[in-house]
Amino acid sequence: MSYRELVVELAREHAEALSDALLELGALSVSVEDADADTPDEQPLFGEPGLVPDRTAWQHSRVIALLSPDHEPAVLLAAAVNDIGVTETPKFDVREVEEQDWVRLTQSQFEPIPIGERIWVVPSWHDAPDPDALILELDPGLAFGTGSHPTTRLCMEWLEQSVKPGQSVLDYGCGSGILAILARKCGANPVVGIDIDPQAVESARQNSERNHAEVTYGLPDACPAGEFDIVVANILSNPLKLMASMLASKVKPGGRIALSGVLARQADEVAAVYARYVDISVWREHEGWVCLAGTRRESH
């Protein structure tokens, strides 16, 4: 017997309460999305880190609850609506969810990714298409960075062209560790990866061990005091601007820095902030995202 999805559309002031009530009544999982997504009425909810959101739910929300076969959707919804004090049952729909081999289905969605001239990012369940290439074995996980996003790809292409053996590299906002691992495989040493998320740091350590790449990882307070030949930061434009002085100070005079997580329309603003410290410009653009790259001046 198949599982079912209960799909409910309602105003934002009731979305969170209904989600909690459905979970308390036995729903296996609940998610909330914008009911106006992919329409002219779609609303952005969360901005970049450092910016305060002006709302906590979409004006027109869609609550999706996954139910086991022994739950009757209409009965469960009526009970949840009653629990939160809503007098009228909102519009809803029920979808059948067939049982599948979810592991196999998920794996089928992730194929080896070629990047640059000789890099392949390969999930552990795949064989490397070219065993002589520079192989990074990486599975999709909780930490950002598998090579599929344009910003990750841009940074990897830049590192492939820029890193020389023996150079020191700092990957600030390392996520999965993909950039730090690549730098090490390109011959950089030492390589340091820093992230504010302890889970990302642990994920990066595991990925480095899997790839036999010696990288030192830690939280921001563990960042070494010295300067690096290369600093790379694939974050977002607002944090990059806030950290400009600190990140620039981690680059040796004459050393290089690469920044991504920046939309093409944000490039001039980010570059203007960093121009106080480095000679910087757009290195490459891909699918609306850019990688900014530059060199720290000998004195500033």
From Swiss-Prot:
Catalytic activity: L-lysyl-[protein] + 3 S-adenosyl-L-methionine = N(6),N(6),N(6)-trimethyl-L-lysyl-[protein] + 3 S-adenosyl-L-homocysteine + 3 H(+)
EC number(s) from the headed UniProt entry: 2.1.1.-
Domain of life: Bacteria
Enzyme class label: transferase
UniProt record, GO biological process: methylation
Binding site residues for S-adenosyl-L-methionine: T152, G173, D195, N234
Keywords annotated in UniProt: Cytoplasm, Methyltransferase, S-adenosyl-L-methionine, Transferase
Subcellular location per the Swiss-Prot or TrEMBL entry: Cytoplasm
GO cellular component, one term: cytosol
One MF annotation (Gene Ontology) recorded for this entry: protein-lysine N-methyltransferase activity
InterPro entries: Ribosomal_L11_MeTrfase_PrmA (IPR050078), Ribosomal_PrmA_MeTrfase (IPR004498), SAM-dependent_MTases_sf (IPR029063)
Chief localisation class: cytoplasm
Residues in the signal sequence: none
Family: Belongs to the methyltransferase superfamily. PrmA family.
Function (record text): Methylates ribosomal protein L11.
Name of protein: Ribosomal protein L11 methyltransferase
Organism field: Burkholderia ambifaria (strain MC40-6)
Gene name, Swiss-Prot/TrEMBL: prmA
